[in-house]
C-alpha cells in the first residue's frame, strides 16, 4: 500500500513539473558553475597527488573545513544560472517557499552536509515553486547575494532571489552520445 502511495506521488510530481531538455549545446551555454562559488585560491593547498593518509590528517581536514567556509564576495548582486538538487526547508503541501540548492542529489539528507560555499538558499516565498523529485536535477536562475544563514539540516553561504526554477531532463540523444563516447 505504501509503495502505491509513493508511486502515485512521484507520478504526480513528474506530471506537474516543467522540464527542459539538456543537450551538450545547452550545457555549454551555462556560464556559471559550482566552482565559481569558491573564492580564487581557496583550495590551492590540496596537492594533485593527495593520498588517503594525507586526506585523513586532522590538520588537512581542518584546512578543508575552513576553505569550505570561504565565500566569493565578487558574486554579490550578480545574476546566476546554477544546476543542482532541491532540498526543501519551508513548504506547505507541494508548494515550496524555501529550499537549499546543493550540487549532488541526497546532500543534507546525510551528514556531513556540503560546505557553506556549496549550499545556496533559494527563496521563492513570493511565488512558491512546486516540489520536485529530490533526485531529479533542476536549474535555478536568479540574483545571488553573499551571506550565511543557518538551518536545521545545513548552513547556506549564498541566497538566490527572484528565482526561476526549471526541471532538467536529459535527452535520449545526449544519453546515447555519452554512452558511445565512453565506449570508444
Where are these regions (language model features)?
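Sec-dependent signal peptide recognition
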Residues: 2-8
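N-terminal signal peptide c-region/cleavage motif recognized by signal peptidases
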Residues: 14-16
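OB-fold and OB-like single-stranded nucleic-acid-recognition modules
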Residues: 19-184
Amino acid at each position: 500500500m505504501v509503495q502505491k502511495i509513493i508511486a502515485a506521488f512521484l507520478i504526480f510530481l513528474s506530471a506537474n513539473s516543467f522540464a527542459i531538455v539538456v543537450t551538450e549545446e545547452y550545457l555549454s551555454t551555462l556560464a556559471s558553475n559550482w566552482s565559481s562559488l569558491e573564492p580564487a585560491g581557496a583550495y590551492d593547498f590540496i596537492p594533485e597527488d593527495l593520498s588517503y593518509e594525507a586526506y585523513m590528517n586532522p590538520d588537512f581536514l581542518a584546512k578543508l573545513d575552513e576553505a569550505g567556509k570561504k565565500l566569493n564576495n565578487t558574486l554579490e548582486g550578480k545574476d546566476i544560472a546554477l544546476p543542482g538538487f532541491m532540498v526543501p526547508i519551508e513548504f506547505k503541501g507541494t508548494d515550496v517557499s524555501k529550499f537549499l540548492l546543493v550540487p549532488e542529489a541526497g546532500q543534507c539528507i546525510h551528514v556531513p552536509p556540503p560546505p557553506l560555499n556549496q549550499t545556496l538558499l533559494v527563496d521563492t516565498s513570493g511565488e512558491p515553486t512546486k516540489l520536485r523529485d529530490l533526485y531529479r536535477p533542476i536549474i535555478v536562475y536568479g540574483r545571488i547575494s553573499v551571506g550565511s544563514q543557518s538551518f536545521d539540516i545545513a548552513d547556506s553561504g549564498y541566497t538566490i532571489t527572484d528565482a526561476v526554477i526549471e526541471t532538467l531532463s536529459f535527452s535520449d540523444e545526449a544519453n546515447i552520445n555519452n554512452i558511445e563516447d565512453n565506449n570508444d
